Amino acid sequence: MGGDLPYRDLNSYLKGRFGERVQKITLDAGLTCPNRDGRIGTGGCLYCNARGSGTGAWDRGQSITAQMQMGIVRLARRYGAAKFIAYFQSFSNTYAPIAKLRKLYDEALAFPQAVGLSLGTRPDCLADDVLDLLAGYARDRLVWLELGLQSAHDATLQRINRGHDVACFTAAATRAAARGLEVVAHVILGLPGEGPQEMAATAAYLGRLPLHGAKIHLLYVVNESGLASLCQSGDYVCLTEDQYIQRVVDFIERLPAHLVIHRLTGDPHPEELVAPAWCLDKPRVLQRLRDEFDRRGTRQGSYFVK
């Protein structure tokens, strides 16, 4: 665990691995998603809008090189960091021809300060040639493959229009891990139709896979998404802050102790957020999570079952 925290936090893990603070630089490569370009669908996932959690940097004409340069300057000034992970976040960052992907990744890794690569993507966007490319990078640097699962329940995945099933994620995570890649599962708590039991079952599912880490995200509502329509009609109600605190602690208690927790809530763009307003106060949410672990006297792995 990191310091005296009740879970294995990312910052402590990175300091242990690299001997100093490491920061992620968020990159927008102007890519798309098979759930938007027509290969699987066109509307995207229920909670996603047309910006796909992106920064819009690519559309503003900023190359990967420019984004890296600006990120290094900004994060070095703010945190005193000298090492960075190139984090391709927007849309599906393994969904393009292999030559294009190699060029994008190489451009980010050309900076001597870049010690690793993190790619947000879908489990159905992992062709063998992409995995082989990433395995090559992983021989001498950190490579995280952040795979979107969201839920371990097929009924939920259908409800949110994911376009893949749980078996697809299982196969993708297993194939990636077999090549030596570090897989981070992205899950969302508060999805429509899910209660405490379903969320806890997703945690148990993660514990059976060859994962490096988990990224836990609150389901918040952004404008121009399908979820926004459901929220405005009253057909979806966000978790309260108290409910979210309980569900996250329940979740982490059921994860194996070795998994690195990459995220514990979300960081919505304030101008896009419809609800819930409480998620904008991230420091308070994180402190309340720690307080709840203290109240229960538990920590990550307390209720993990092999």
What do the PLM-derived regions correspond to, one by one?
Residues M1-S12, F18-Q23, G213, V221-K306:
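Auxiliary Fe-S-binding modules of radical SAM enzymes
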Residues R51-G71, L75-I98, P112-L126, L142-F169, ...:
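Core AdoMet radical
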Residues I98-D106, A127-G136, M199:
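Distinct, well-ordered alpha-helical segments
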